[in-house]
Amino acid sequence: MPKVRTKDVMDKFKLELISGEEGINRPITMSDLSRPGLEMAGYFTYYPKERVQLLGKTEITFFEKLPEEEKKQRMLSLCTEITPAIILSRDLPIPPELVEASEENGVPVLRSPLKTTRLTSRLTNFLESQLAPTTAIHGVLVDVYGVGVLIIGKSGVGKSETALELVKRGHRLVADDCVEIRQEDQDTLIGSAPELIEHLLEIRGLGIINVMTLFGAGAVRSFKRITLVMSLELWEQGKQYDRLGLEEETMKIIDTDVPKLTIPVRPGRNLAVIIEVAAMNFRLKRMGLNAAEQFTHKLADVIEDGELEE
């Protein structure tokens, strides 16, 4: 089933339907728009007919100056069997040749009062968001001090319990158990909860709780950008864990590498506090303050001074 249809765009931006109503369920498969300027001049060799076509003042003014015999042919060539829609900006008058061609080929003709540039920007942003690559990950997403922390790990390791403690400490839950992720651009991952389990948290022995009902609207978020992954795993005796914080591990989600920390779990460790500190430390690193690097530089200076004294 297509993610976006012409009707979705029409409803989202309250566009006026002029003609071609039978095609309002046509699928839109790409976020790129087309301004068919060259096509108005008769050059259709590389016409991107699978895109939404946007006609502004420039295109319509040029079209009106064409000879009558060419107008109908231009519009028939513009309205193909796979063109999702033709949108006119600025409430421009609709050429009768366009109405006739759209009815003949079932291409919706829509109109907006917005300026062409603004309409282009809004349409592109909406389509990129809706058509972005998506995936789903088993885990918990929490907003901790403004950092989107994705908590992952095997079932039963304590992800939901940790999220509950974080919510009690004033942070905000985004999703539990299943996190739906979409890649809005090259380095931006947005996580959200499936509608069925939004604001819900499952705690073993307690059952399902509604976080918004228990803790208020300030304890939840609808979506959050994922900037840090925390992997919880049971403590393995003999396994070496990072103790300085110099090793930078990443996790690939869709096409984006996200910084990842592995936290060993065992009785007595307060995971909520560790995640809070990890989020604050992550923000400090992005500001250029790295405690681990400062320590190694100081250690190197001490060693160097000791060697000089000898």
UniProtKB/Swiss-Prot annotation:
Its EC number is 2.7.11.-, 2.7.4.-. InterPro entries: HPr(Ser)_kin/Pase, Hpr_kin/Pase_C, Hpr_kin/Pase_Hpr_N, P-loop_NTPase, Ser_kin/Pase_Hpr-like_N_sf. It catalyses: [HPr protein]-L-serine + ATP = [HPr protein]-O-phospho-L-serine + ADP + H(+); [HPr protein]-O-phospho-L-serine + phosphate + H(+) = [HPr protein]-L-serine + diphosphate. Mg(2+) binds at residues 160, 202. The keyword GTP-binding does not apply. Residues 264-269 are annotated as: Important for the catalytic mechanism of dephosphorylation. ATP binds at residues 153-160. The active site is at 138, 159, 177 (proton acceptor), 243. Catalyzes the ATP- as well as the pyrophosphate-dependent phosphorylation of a specific serine residue in HPr, a phosphocarrier protein of the phosphoenolpyruvate-dependent sugar phosphotransferase system (PTS). HprK/P also catalyzes the pyrophosphate-producing, inorganic phosphate-dependent dephosphorylation (phosphorolysis) of seryl-phosphorylated HPr (P-Ser-HPr). Homohexamer. This is HPr kinase/phosphorylase. It comes from Bacillus licheniformis (strain ATCC 14580 / DSM 13 / JCM 2505 / CCUG 7422 / NBRC 12200 / NCIMB 9375 / NCTC 10341 / NRRL NRS-1264 / Gibson 46). The gene is hprK.
